């Protein structure tokens, strides 16, 4: 039996937006996303690509048909608003009682959510999966509050529709810092949905968006082991700091969003969190699984770690890098 763990809204958002040349959602064994709410709630609105978790006549959750869960990279389950793994729902019941006494209204229709539907469903799925089953912390309510543009009423997704899905930038610091590519940086709908106001462009190419003065920091370097990205780290960090301080979301991007932009964000996390290169690397890798700064950038990041922390604490000769 696999483990059942919590998954934040940001983690699910990033899972949905992983890509290589195409969205990872097009891979049949990548993600099984299950909605454990009622049929009515599911039909009203659910997270894109989610399937409704079915139950038998005794209200026991059933394994989804035609899905090989033991081969799935991710299995994520959500209900309305589960926020812990104990499943007792005491906080939710307490909140409902407060609403009852204040408004004299109690909606019994939603009482079945207090028993931790997502947890019950996840435990059934964990009996056949190899990897941990994730329960979405905060459920649909929290996720849809942050990412309203990922709500859908579509029940069936055709393969071509999945192939045509255009991923959004990866979220590094919730609501404030994103990692993307040139196409995403040029998409007005993405900028609006994520409330992105500022860009750090780590590529030779410009975007087709005209940003106000002071809202873009351009680092025109090629993706080469000989490129001196280090000289731009201090001013880039100051730029990101100044915009995040005013709750202004920043998108850091390069042509493909894999090497140059990843390197700059690793440098920023070392500066921002005063963490090691290894810790910053692990965070970016967790957010974007195919990030890969070139070897020249790795050496520069090692120098940056020493400049910020006073010591070189990460062994970059390790094959991991």
Q: Which positions does each model-derived feature cover?
A:
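Generic low-complexity segments that are intrinsically disordered, proline-rich and/or Lys/Arg-biased
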Residues: 19-20, 65, 104, 320
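Long, low-complexity intrinsically disordered regulatory regions
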Residues: 1-2, 159, 321
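Cysteine-based protein phosphatase catalytic domain of the PTP/DSP
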Residues: 25-252, 256, 264-312
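N-terminal alpha-helical scaffolding segments that mark the starts
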Residues: 1-33, 38-41
């Amino acid at each position: 039996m696999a483990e059942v763990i919590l998954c934040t809204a940001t983690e699910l958002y990033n899972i949905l937006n992983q890509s290589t040349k195409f969205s990872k959602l097009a891979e049949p064994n990548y993600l099984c996303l299950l909605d454990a709410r009622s049929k009515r709630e599911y039909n009203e609105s659910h997270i894109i690509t989610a399937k409704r978790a079915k139950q038998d006549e005794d209200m026991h959750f059933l394994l989804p048909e035609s899905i090989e869960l033991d081969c799935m990279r991710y299995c994520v389950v959500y209900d309305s608003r589960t926020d812990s793994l104990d499943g007792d729902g005491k906080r939710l019941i307490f909140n409902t009682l407060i609403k009852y006494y204040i408004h004299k209204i109690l909606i019994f229709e939603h009482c079945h959510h207090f028993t931790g539907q997502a947890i019950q469903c996840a435990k059934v799925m964990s009996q056949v999966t190899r990897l941990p089953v994730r329960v979405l912390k905060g459920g649909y309510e929290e996720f849809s509050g942050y990412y309203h543009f990922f709500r859908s009423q579509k029940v069936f997704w055709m393969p071509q529709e999945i192939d045509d899905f255009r991923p959004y930038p990866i979220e590094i610091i919730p609501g404030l810092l994103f990692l993307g590519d040139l196409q995403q940086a040029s998409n007005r709908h993405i900028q609006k949905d994520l409330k992105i106001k500022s860009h750090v462009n780590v590529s030779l190419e410009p975007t087709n968006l005209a940003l106000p003065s002071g809202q873009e920091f351009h680092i025109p370097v090629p993706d080469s082991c000989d490129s001196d990205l280090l000289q731009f780290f201090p001013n880039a960090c100051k730029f990101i700091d100044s915009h995040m301080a005013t709750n202004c979301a920043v998108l850091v991007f390069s042509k493909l969003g894999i090497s140059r932009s990843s390197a700059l964000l690793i440098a920023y996390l070392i500066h921002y969190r005063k963490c090691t290169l290894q810790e910053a690397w692990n965070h970016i890798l967790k957010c974007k699984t195919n990030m890969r700064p070139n070897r020249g950038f790795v050496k520069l990041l090692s120098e940056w770690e020493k400049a910020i922390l006073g010591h070189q604490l990460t062994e970059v000769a390790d094959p991991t890098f």
